[in-house]
Swiss-Prot record:
The gene is alaS. SMART domains: tRNA_SAD (SM00863). This is Alanine--tRNA ligase. It is found in: Cytoplasm. Zn(2+) binds at residues 568, 572, 670, 674. The keyword Transport does not apply.
Length: 878
């Protein structure tokens, strides 16, 4: 077998399909762009949905890619099996309505078996097909020449995730030999496609030819597609003859580096240790790429997944004897392994290391955080007069802080509480069910819109240079059908040329009107989006008859566009100013450009201080007042990068790109509309800055007239406050507010003193009744206070004054009874425990409880039982 590196295999795959007329699509960011159904990009086809559901028509219907992907559905299996990974690469070739089975099947065989390419032994390959897919069966047998006994019909070979595109698929298996197997040769599962380790699936070709309708019916799609997927890690393990994916050049450098950081553990010596080595190597790849693509550790969403992976790796490091921070040291190794196709990892190495190191340091505090949450949970349960920690709370401790259920149960028992084990298991099962369903939910696709797909009109955008264009109306769509004319209602229009900007890149669509050549307004443009074939599709409210083929005048609202261009140019200035103040690690994470305000999301590890925010704002205004020219140039992507233009990692760029340059200060790739000069913006004012997720911040701002209005409104508000507070000038407001705060603090202090004095008077009355109970002095009383907090205060005073050996107090709040028991040290030594006593008397008030030997509490629902409970306490001690 050929000796090939993983980098060579990846490149050979792309080169093979490039020779077959495919465009090579660069690997997209792991963070989905404009796809709310996905947490992560989890397959090669996930980034191509817009082509397959017909929203966009690709320049070339033949596409190939090597797509980095993350799946965490089966995270508990990582390290325990030969092939489960959180991060992996999918090699894929795709046809959007072009070639089909007759080409896809022979090409797969050629790539795998040809000596020019991978050169696998054809005798070790088997395929599976859907029983009803006679075409695929025929092609494998007649065109490829595969023997019938190596074509296995499997009922599960039908790709269907609910509504949307679906179809039969064909899988290719490599026979690794019986020595790799985990079942006997005569086992019924010992066949390609069965549950065994001998036959390894290396390629899956999906023939997407049907559309699954909501009513369950399957109809043929207007355009049939090919969607293939081959895991790079699997294919490399076959080529490098590795026992599992982990013994390949994609993982072994990471495993070896981890072993070098362990005092005494080595890979291959102990099965349990090997699992930890594999988990660390796998998770190091996932977190490195995820952070590089803009994800940050957090307590929800993809940030939570990231945090869980880092902490899981750290815990496995501890099992290997690695107690210091180490995960961040694996980042450059990941970068070196993958640099031939993903050079950006090494370019961002310092930032990725910083994020992981920070998370490792933070994790040391996590167990303490977990303990604090557990204590708060226990206190809350007691305050509600309950005796059980619910399953959801126990699961949160496990899921967020890594607290094993056994540890939570142990702490609860010390406090006289129990844990809802059944509820915990229910939460665990629900999480696993969500994980199982995630793949099908995430991969859902919309159906193709044949009407829009069939619109082939060439449409030119003229809006960079003019706001009014005369153009021929080429297509009218109403009621999901092409029309020759339209007289009323809402319609969608395509013109041969238009000045209207279609929504893209965070910039909203233009608004305006359409006039006939007589000057009459015939429609109002309310929205503009791109049609599947790339034309601006105008959504309009029709006022007068419009006829296909007739010329009209399209006019963009100049006030609307004027506000948009100012705010869009401001986002470019803001982006560069943030980099100048916070550092080059800061990246744009999203934006919204409206005519009256702008929103800008960016990555940053910590909060932005008021001083930093003020500096950013000052820089932007300085550039506005410097009257810098705004120029644009079209060039190829490589030239743009050499010029130093900033590109967004979430964007995909074509061969020709537009560079927007603001003086010598800012240069970005951007297809939006902009001001001609920064002086057009007039003024820039940040209105808010906040965190919208771990490592992601959001700035909202206004420019020009909106900025003036914002500042003027603030002045009006200050004047109103000054009037209400009887202050002559607004500059004196801070001093007045400080005075009011000091006065309030003094009043609060006096109030607390009065409450304490009242509590002492109450305590004196409660503690007067000391009675003998056997050999012990007992205070047992209905304290008649507000609730459990007040009972605890009384118990604290009792402990300080050492009034008796045992204290039993009760009170009623509404229909709830609260009980507290406290025991002095000498009585505890003699065997009297607060937890035992509370368990005896709590049932008499219709409740239960528990606690420590020195203090316990309970709740109940039977106020009438208080006298019996107090009497029972005396009997218990007698």
């Amino acid at each position: 077998m050929k000796q090939l590196t993983s980098a060579q295999v990846r490149q050979m795959f792309l080169d093979f399909f490039k020779e077959k007329g495919h465009d090579v699509e660069p690997s997209a960011s792991l963070i989905p762009d404009e796809d709310p159904t996905l947490l992560w990009i989890n397959s090669g086809v996930a980034t191509l949905k817009k082509y397959f559901d017909g929203r966009v028509v690709p320049n070339n219907p033949r596409i190939t890619n090597a797509q980095k992907s993350i799946r965490t559905n089966d995270i508990e299996n990582v390290g325990k099996t030969a092939r489960h990974h959180t991060f992996f690469e999918m090699l894929g070739n795709f046809s959007v309505g072009d070639y089909f089975k007759e080409d896809a099947i022979p090409w797969a065989w050629e790539f795998l078996t040809s000596d020019k390419w991978i050169g696998l032994d054809p005798e070790k390959l088997y395929v599976t097909v859907y029983p009803k897919d006679k075409d695929a069966h025929r092609i494998w047998h007649e065109k490829v020449g595969l023997a019938e006994d190596r074509i296995i019909e499997v009922e599960d070979n039908f790709w269907d995730i609910g509504e949307g595109p679906c179809g039969p698929d064909s899988e290719i298996f490599y026979d690794r030999g019986q020595s790799f197997n985990n079942v006997s040769e005569d086992d019924p599962e010992n066949y390609p496609g069965g549950e065994n380790e001998r036959y390894l699936e290396v390629w899956n070709i999906v023939f997407s030819e049907f559309n699954h309708l909501p009513n369950g019916e399957y109809v043929e799609q207007p355009h049939k597609n090919i969607d293939t997927g081959m895991g790079l890690e699997r294919l490399v393990s076959v080529i490098q003859e590795a026992p599992t994916n982990f013994e390949t050049d994609l993982f072994m450098p990471l495993i070896e580096a981890t072993a070098a950081m362990s005092d005494h553990k080595q890979y291959g010596q102990n099965a349990a240790d090997d699992i930890s080595f594999k988990i660390i190597a796998d998770h190091a790849r996932a977190v490195t790429f995820a952070i590089g693509d803009g994800a940050m550790p957090a307590n929800e969403g993809r940030g939570y997944v990231l945090r869980r992976l880092i902490r899981r790796a750290i815990l496995n490091g501890k099992k290997l004897g690695i107690n210091d921070a180490f995960m961040y040291k694996l980042v450059p190794i990941v970068g070196e392994i993958m640099h031939s196709y993903y050079p950006d990892v090494l370019e961002q190495k310092d930032f990725i290391e910083k994020v992981i190191r920070s998370e490792e340091d933070r994790f040391r505090e996590t167990l303490n955080d977990g303990l604090r949450l557990l204590n708060q949970t226990i206190e809350a349960v007691k305050a509600e007069n309950e005796t059980e920690i619910n399953g959801a709370d126990a699961f949160k401790l496990f899921d967020t802080f890594g607290f094993p259920i056994e540890l939570t149960t142990e702490y609860a028992e010390d406090e006289g509480l129990t844990v809802d084990q059944a509820g915990f298991e229910k939460e665990m099962a629900a999480q696993k069910a969500r994980a199982r369903n995630a793949r099908s939910d995430e991969q859902s696709m919309g159906s193709q819109n044949e009407v829009l797909l069939n619109i082939k009109t060439k449409s030119e955008f003229t809006g960079y240079s003019e706001l009014e264009t005369e153009s021929r109306l080429a297509d009218i769509i109403q009621d999901n059908a092409e029309q020759e004319s339209v007289t009323t209602g809402v319609a969608q229009l395509v013109f041969e040329a238009t000045p209207f900007y279609a929504e893209m890149g965070g910039q909203v669509a233009d608004q305006g009107i359409i006039k006939n050549l007589a000057g009459q307004v015939v429609a109002e443009v309310t929205d503009v989006q791109y049609a599947p074939n790339g034309q601006p599709l105008h959504t309009v409210k029709v006022l007068k008859e419009m006829i296909s083929g007739v010329h009209y005048t399209l006019s963009v609202d100049p006030t609307f566009r004027g506000g948009v261009v100012k705010n869009h140019t401001a986002t470019h200035l803001l982006d560069q100013a943030l980099r100048d103040v916070l550092g080059e690690h800061t990246h744009q994470a999203g934006s919204l450009v409206e005519p009256d305000y702008l929103r800008f999301d960016f990555t940053n590890l910590g909060q932005v201080t008021p001083d930093q925010l003020a500096e950013v704002e000052q820089i932007v205004n300085d550039k506005i007042w410097a009257a810098l020219p705004v120029n644009t140039v079209e060039t190829d992507i490589e030239t743009a990068k050499q010029m130093g233009a900033i590109a967004l990692f979430t964007e995909k760029y074509g061969k020709t790109v537009r560079v927007v340059q603001i003086g010598d200060y800012s240069m970005e790739l951007c297809g939006g509309t902009h001001a001609n000069n920064t002086s057009d913006l007039g003024l820039f004012k940040i209105t808010s800055e906040s965190g919208i997720g771990a490592g992601t911040r959001r700035i909202e701002a206004v420019t020009s007239k909106a900025a003036f209005k914002y500042l003027n409104d603030k002045q009006v508000l200050l004047n109103e406050l000054a009037s209400e507070l009887k202050v002559a000038q607004t500059k004196d407001l801070p001093k007045k507010i400080q005075q009011l705060q000091a006065d309030l603090k003094a009043e609060q202090k006096e109030n607390e003193q009065l409450k304490a004095k009242f509590a002492q008077e109450q305590a004196g009355n409660v503690f007067e009744n000391v009675v003998e109970a056997g050999q012990w002095r007992l205070v047992a009383a209905d304290a008649k206070v507000a609730g459990m907090n007040e009972l605890r205060q009384l118990a604290d005073q009792w402990q300080q004054k050492q009034i008796s050996d045992v204290l039993v107090l009760a009170t009623v709040a509404g229909d709830k009874v609260s009980l507290i028991v406290a025991v002095a040290p000498d009585a505890i030594k003699a065997g009297i425990k607060a937890g035992d006593l509370i368990k005896q008397i709590a049932p008499l008030v219709g409740g239960g409880g528990g606690g420590r030997p020195d203090m316990a509490q309970a709740g109940g629902k039977n106020p009438a039982g208080i006298p019996d409970a107090l009497a029972a306490a005396k009997e218990f001690l007698a």
